Amino acid sequence: RHYGYRIFTYQNIRDINERLYQYCRNYSEDAFRYGAKRIIAYDENKSPFRIRFSIMHELGHIMLGHSRECAYNEQQANFFASNILAPRMAIHFAQCRNEDDVSSVFQISREAGSYAFQNYRLWKESAAREVSDVDEAMYRHFYHDEREEFIYSIKPCMICGETIYNSSEDLCLHCRMEHIRRQHTPLYTSRND
């Protein structure tokens, strides 16, 4: 949306224009972009991980200025999506040990997690020799001075809305403790008078 594109599900497109829906479906089972109308559409029946990747893949085509389909452009769009969803530096600071960690922390498919982790290992070797200008800029952008740490994940607590940083938990520490306390509090107590 930031780039002026509207995002629709395939069902939304079908409700608006059956012909465009058929074109989307024939073009891709996952997602489609229509540059002239500034539209990205995706199949809402895919997994949430696949949807996120597909939308970022289409955004990659847009950001990289791709005007035609070819294998090289597809590789570039995949690389873009992978790095947007699981930046290699963020994989490092999240201390991911394998592709399952990457998939879990960054909410991407196992296949995407495997690709990202393999690429991370190459990045790590390169970064050990020399930190690139891009890496320095990324570090500055995601480093939180007050927290004194690199931030790779920000989300609100599902109960109180407090900001949770760098955690796979959906509840803040206070709400988790309250939840545990309630689970272990007896419904009634007996009195021995």
Q: Which positions does each model-derived feature cover?
A:
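Active-site hotspot residues in diverse enzymes, especially metal/ion-binding acidic/histidine motifs
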Residues: R1-D193
